[in-house]
A protein has these predicted regions:
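Short Cys/His-based metal-binding microdomains
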Residues: 63-111
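Active-site metal-binding core of divalent-cation-utilizing nuclease and nuclease-like domains
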Residues: 62-68, 107, 111-157, 171
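Metal-dependent nuclease catalytic cores in nucleic-acid-processing enzymes
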Residues: 112, 174-190
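Intrinsic disorder
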Residues: 38-41, 66, 82, 95-102, ...
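Domain-level recognition of nuclease-like catalytic cores that cleave nucleotide substrates
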Residues: 191-258
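Helix/loop segments that flank and initiate small ligand/metal-binding modules
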Residues: 1-78
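Short beta-strand-loop-alpha-helix junction that forms the active-site gateway
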Residues: 152, 157-172, 197-200
């Protein structure tokens, strides 16, 4: 079989699963499974169908003969799974994907803020309870969150997207923030977490230092696992809602938090 035929088959059948095998962080697999098992039945079923790329987005329903067109409701591109949950430029402009991203970020920031002797700088447009990271990083760079504790600086950059793009997203962020990390490291001890997460809650192996990062910050092992499970939970639930609204007008909900 030619390479193009193989890629076409993977695109329509198992590209998500193949990406998880290649890029997922093994040490968080147990946590992901435990979260998924406790999901409401509708979200659990959605997640399983997501993994097999057999959800009723238009490119699929058109291929199944159940829709006249396979195009997106908002733009002239095909409404593939990846397009719905992270690729549509109109959805991006409407800040649909920001809502998912910032819901996760808010959870991480609030948990970190509860630690002793830390100052949290976090870039969340909908929330005014944190100082801007640019106070530390300057205007040229603005990572999602910076935490200062004495002479240590903890930097986290969160990216959420389609699983086949996890590694590419992580590499892009690594290159983007390297100058900042190098600059801060001249005077401080810097810990950088490049947290690339798939839309189904899969954590990329580029975040292999996640447990050490949290431990150094002051979280216990139990607290770290809870926070990772919560990250996965929020990611799955928000992706489910984004998919349900794929053909509908968007009114940004409050950030998902508990």
């Amino acid at each position: 079989m030619k390479k193009n035929s193989i890629e076409t088959s993977l695109t329509t059948q198992s590209l998500v699963i193949k990406s998880i095998w290649s890029y997922a962080l093994p040490s968080t697999a147990r946590l992901w499974s435990s979260v998924l098992e406790k999901m409401p039945r509708n979200i659990y079923t959605f997640s399983i169908r997501y993994l097999g790329n057999c959800l009723p987005n238009r490119s699929n329903t058109h291929r199944w003969g159940a829709a006249v067109s396979g195009l997106c409701s908002f733009c002239p591109n095909r409404q593939t799974l990846g397009h719905v949950i992270g690729g549509c430029k109109i959805s991006l402009e409407e800040k649909r994907f920001n809502w998912r991203h910032n819901s996760i970020l808010l959870s991480l920031a609030r948990a970190t803020k509860a630690l002793p002797f830390v100052t949290v700088y976090c870039d969340i447009e909908e929330c005014q309870e944190f100082l801007s990271p640019s106070i530390i990083s300057g205007d040229s760079f603005r990572p999602n969150m910076i935490v200062v504790r004495e002479k240590e600086i903890f930097v986290i950059e969160l990216t959420v997207g389609f699983e086949p793009n996890m590694q590419k997203n992580a590499l892009r962020k690594q290159q983007r923030y390297k100058p900042l990390i190098d600059s801060l490291s001249k005077t401080q001890s810097v810990h950088f977490l490049n947290l690339s997460v798939g839309a189904a809650g899969i954590i990329s192996n580029d975040a292999a230092n996640i447990f050490n990062w949290m431990k150094n910050l002051g979280f216990s092992q139990k607290e770290s696992e809870y926070l990772i499970r919560k990250t996965i939970n929020i990611c799955i639930r928000t992706t489910y809602y984004l998919f349900c609204r794929r053909d509908k007008p968007w009114e940004t909900p409050k950030l998902l938090s508990w």
